[in-house]
């Protein structure tokens, strides 16, 4: 097979990486369905996986436990494979309130959602790449197990255009409407088309940087060209082009009409059941809602909440799993599950929560029983669909260990020669004062500190106390959204503050080489936050620093603490022995802060890097402006910032806010 993946890197595998790469490749070639890579923090697990993908030449899906980690992996894979299709597939909701009913207060909550258009475009781009190419890496969140349009119907709906084909202009416009594209001759944006004489311009739903122009001569396609939507500049002419549907949920008209008949039959049966049980209100409610949906489907081809009829629209039998992203992954595909100790339980937990909410809606006449089949996959369905799988974690869970028959591929030695942190246990009685002393030692040498507490209240009190003592401290909690969380991590790395206090900092999983101390308060309180796995993960946050140290405050050493300390010590000894044998001197890890910055922006392919340099470039340009020109620029940027905020584009608004602050400083600076 032709080698499709081209790995770009300035580094060669080193440390434990070559052996890990070899073992993973051999296991996959020998048909092993499950392998577990135990890789410590900072050991280059992503680079190991990139080498395996490149050598085996297989389309790959990488599952991450949250959007933040998915974005980090996406950025790293884009750097490793700039010539290949690296795609991003996460939930496209910035905000999502599912439909629900609370019987105790007789409250019905309508579905409400805000869709992030850019992520929707990237999802469409991901499925297009899986259908068209072999060299694909899709980085996804647990969103991958939720229902998606049926790939067979999706393929049938595509509009294939070739130069010289005979097709009427009206026929093209009708097909575009079926694909849910809308005509807009004034504003040309993603998912729209416009007509100018005999030319039709289409802005593909999965594209962010090009549109296609169909030039007709009578009923013949004379020319197909790709052009820049903003400037209209022709980029190139092409012999053929395929227009993909605007959404994954598009359905042919014939299938919609057939589905409507099936829905009517189910409605009649359900009405009989409700009337037989004297549920008159529920029967009337269900009839009214379903008939309204049927009317909308007949007239427009879709309705609000059409996903609740997905069983009929995709032609599935009752109880069958929904089509998901896994149905788009080729049969020879590979699955990599990152932070598997978190991701696997997530996959298992999605179905039950969804089922219980929908069961109430069905029982009280808000939905037909078939709505229960609009659901995420069950765990056993996920297992049956998953291709050959590699689990990656510093602390693998019981599921992965069981599936791998207890055999682990270890990646403990870091290419940089860095050792696991030194661990000290200190008494609880003086933990806060001792911590303050340790923080001050780190601040002097420009290093950062992470502190993890057991409760929200304690985290708040500690943050307040440290601030009163003159320390630059921030508090990370569950109410902070993904983007702001990334910005806080970025500010910590930039030195905007020195100490970050949180409850469950281990879930971040972000690279913070500047952190040299992790302090775990009340480490001797057994429980979820102080389990062996949690302690190892938290200690690992200091593993990227040359002076990495972890202090566990506890009056006794619990079983979990002992296991975590012993495991860290075992790894440290192995690392020291390797360094001594090879003559390696541990090196400070240099990770550009730009890498983290890119995660906080909207995930625009190929453009994030340009955007992060904007502030620096502009500061140089602004110094040449007069005070009057600077004031005018501030007013202009403030207007844009408010517009972005109104459109819920908070990342862009935040970027402009930073620029305005810089201009204000420039304006107030002594001349």
From Swiss-Prot:
It comes from Hamiltonella defensa subsp. Acyrthosiphon pisum (strain 5AT). The keyword Disulfide bond does not apply. This is UvrABC system protein B. GO terms for cellular component: cytoplasm; excinuclease repair complex. Residues 631-666 form the UVR domain. It is found in: Cytoplasm. The UvrABC repair system catalyzes the recognition and processing of DNA lesions. A damage recognition complex composed of 2 UvrA and 2 UvrB subunits scans DNA for abnormalities. Upon binding of the UvrA(2)B(2) complex to a putative damaged site, the DNA wraps around one UvrB monomer. DNA wrap is dependent on ATP binding by UvrB and probably causes local melting of the DNA helix, facilitating insertion of UvrB beta-hairpin between the DNA strands. Then UvrB probes one DNA strand for the presence of a lesion. The lineage of its organism: Bacteria, Pseudomonadati, Pseudomonadota, Gammaproteobacteria, Enterobacterales. PROSITE patterns: HELICASE_ATP_BIND_1 (PS51192), HELICASE_CTER (PS51194), UVR (PS50151). GO terms for molecular function: ATP binding; ATP hydrolysis activity; DNA binding; excinuclease ABC activity; helicase activity. The gene is uvrB.
């Amino acid at each position: 097979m032709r080698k499709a993946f081209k790995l770009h890197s300035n580094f060669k595998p080193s440390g434990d990486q070559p052996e890990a790469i070899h073992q993973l490749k051999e296991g996959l070639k020998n048909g092993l369905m499950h392998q577990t890579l135990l890789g410590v923090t900072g050991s280059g697990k992503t680079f190991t996986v990139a080498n395996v993908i490149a050598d085996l030449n297989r389309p790959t899906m990488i599952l991450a436990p949250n959007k933040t980690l998915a974005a980090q992996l996406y950025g790293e894979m884009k750097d490793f494979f700039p010539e290949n299709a690296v795609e991003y597939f996460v939930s496209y909701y910035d905000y999502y309130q599912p439909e629900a009913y609370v019987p105790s207060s007789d409250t019905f909550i309508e579905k409400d959602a805000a869709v992030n258009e850019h992520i929707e475009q990237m999802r469409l781009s991901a499925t297009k790449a899986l259908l068209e190419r072999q060299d694909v890496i899709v980085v996804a969140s647990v969103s991958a197990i939720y229902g998606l349009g049926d790939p067979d119907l999706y393929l049938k709906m595509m509009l294939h255009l070739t130069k010289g084909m005979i097709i009427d202009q009206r026929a093209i416009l009708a097909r575009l409407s079926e694909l849910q594209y809308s005509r807009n001759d004034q504003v040309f944006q993603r998912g729209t088309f416009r007509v100018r004489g005999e030319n039709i311009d289409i802005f593909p739903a999965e594209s962010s940087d090009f549109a296609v122009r169909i030039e007709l001569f009578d009923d013949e396609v004379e020319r197909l060209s790709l052009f820049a939507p903003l400037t209209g500049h022709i980029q190139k002419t092409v012999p053929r082009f395929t227009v993909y549907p605007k959404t994954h949920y598009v359905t042919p008209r014939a299938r919609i009409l057939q589905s409507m008949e099936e829905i009517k039959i189910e409605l009649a049966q359900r009405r009989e059941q409700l009337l037989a049980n004297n549920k008159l209100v529920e029967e009337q409610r269900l009839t009214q809602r379903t008939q309204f949906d049927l009317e909308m489907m007949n007239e427009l081809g879709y309705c609000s909440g059409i996903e609740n009829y997905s069983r009929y629209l995709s032609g599935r039998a009752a109880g069958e799993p929904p089509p998901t992203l896994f149905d788009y992954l080729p049969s020879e595909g590979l699955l990599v599950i990152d932070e598997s100790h978190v991701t696997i339980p997530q996959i298992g937990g999605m179905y039950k929560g969804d089922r219980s909410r929908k069961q109430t809606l069905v029982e009280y006449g808000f939905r037909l029983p078939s709505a229960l089949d609009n659901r995420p996959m069950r765990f056993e369905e996920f297992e049956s669909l998953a291709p050959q799988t590699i689990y990656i974690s510093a602390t693998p869970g019981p599921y992965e260990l069981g599936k791998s028959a207890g055999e682990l591929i270890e990646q403990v030695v870091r290419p940089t020669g860095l050792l696991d942190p030194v661990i000290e246990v200190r008494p609880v009685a003086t933990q806060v004062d001792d911590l303050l002393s340790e923080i001050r030692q780190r601040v002097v040498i420009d290093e950062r500190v992470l502190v993890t507490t057991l409760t929200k209240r304690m985290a708040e009190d500690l943050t307040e106390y440290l601030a009163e003592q003159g320390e630059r401290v921030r508090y990370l909690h569950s109410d902070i959204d993904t983007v702001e969380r990334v910005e806080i991590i970025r500010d910590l790395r930039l030195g905007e503050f020195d100490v970050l206090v949180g409850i469950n900092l281990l879930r971040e999983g972000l690279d913070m080489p500047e952190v040299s101390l992790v302090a775990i308060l009340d480490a001797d309180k057994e429980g979820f936050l102080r389990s062996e796995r949690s302690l190892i993960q938290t200690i690992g946050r200091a593993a990227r620093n040359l002076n990495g140290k972890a202090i566990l405050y506890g009056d006794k050493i619990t079983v979990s603490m002992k296991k975590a300390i012993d495991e860290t010590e075992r790894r440290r000894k192995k690392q020291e022995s390797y360094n001594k044998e090879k003559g390696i001197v541990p090196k400070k890890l240099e990770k550009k802060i730009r890498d983290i910055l890119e995660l906080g922006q909207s995930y625009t392919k190929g453009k994030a890097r340009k955007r992060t340099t904007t502030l620096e470039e502009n500061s140089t340009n602004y110094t040449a402006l007069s005070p009057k020109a600077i004031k005018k620029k501030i007013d202009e940027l403030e207007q844009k910032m408010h517009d972005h905020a109104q459109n819920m584009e908070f990342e862009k608004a935040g970027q402009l806010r930073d620029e305005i602050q810089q201009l204000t400083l420039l304006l107030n600076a002594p001349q």
